[in-house]
Curated annotation (Swiss-Prot):
GO terms for cellular component: plasma membrane. Its main location: membrane. The chain crosses the membrane at residues 24-44, 82-102, 135-155. This is Uncharacterized protein RP437. It is a multi-pass membrane protein. Keywords: Cell membrane, Membrane, Transmembrane, Transmembrane helix. It is found in: Cell membrane. It comes from Rickettsia prowazekii (strain Madrid E). InterPro entries: Pra-immunoreactive, RDD. The keyword Membrane applies.
Length: 173
């Protein structure tokens, strides 16, 4: 006898995503903050030393980069460092988010919120565990999320656009 496949509805998928994003934020914020202040020191230690900032006081460091003096410092040929600093902070955040999703998807076939809601991600055709390539595609296709999530409403398998792109589907386990 064939096992019946149940596809989670739109609200359940949205709720699951909201839980995951809350959890990722909880994890990512301290990591991002740690990286932010360490990279800030690495890139701009000459500025902090020149204005005698207490580098152990993150508020002081942050306030100093919001000042007119820092703006003048950037205009003196340090703007490229500032751009690179921001790119690295962005990359750090993406890496943390990517690590959470792809690691859970790959090793557990689900995320913590989907596990709690008894859902899992499978290959849309075979219903087996998706390949790493599919999971990476799925993550990269999350860029379509704000619009792509509405595809669930019109799909018999309740697939969002990122599911279709990756060839995956979310089912109740």
């Amino acid at each position: 006898m064939k096992k019946q496949i149940i596809y989670p509805d739109f609200i359940t998928r949205i709720f699951s995503t909201a839980l995951d994003l809350s959890l990722v934020a909880f994890i990512a914020i301290p990591i991002s903050q740690f990286c932010f202040f360490n990279l800030l020191w690495l890139f701009f230690h000459d500025y902090f030393l020149s204005i005698k900032i207490n580098i152990h006081n993150s508020n002081e460091m942050f306030n100093s980069i919001m000042s007119q003096e820092f703006y003048e410092y950037l205009k003196l040929g340090n703007f490229n460092k500032y751009i690179l600093f921001n790119i690295l902070i962005f990359a750090t955040n993406i890496l943390v988010i990517c690590s959470y999703f792809i690691t859970f998807w790959y090793y557990k076939g689900t995320t913590l919120s989907k596990m709690f809601l008894r859902m899992k991600i499978v290959d849309a055709v075979t219903l087996n565990r998706p390949t790493l390539k599919q999971l990476i595609k799925r993550f990269l296709a999350y860029i379509t999320f704000p619009i792509g999530i509405f595809f669930i409403l019109f799909s018999s398998k309740k697939q969002a656009l990122h599911d279709r792109i990756a060839g995956t589907v979310v089912i109740k386990s």
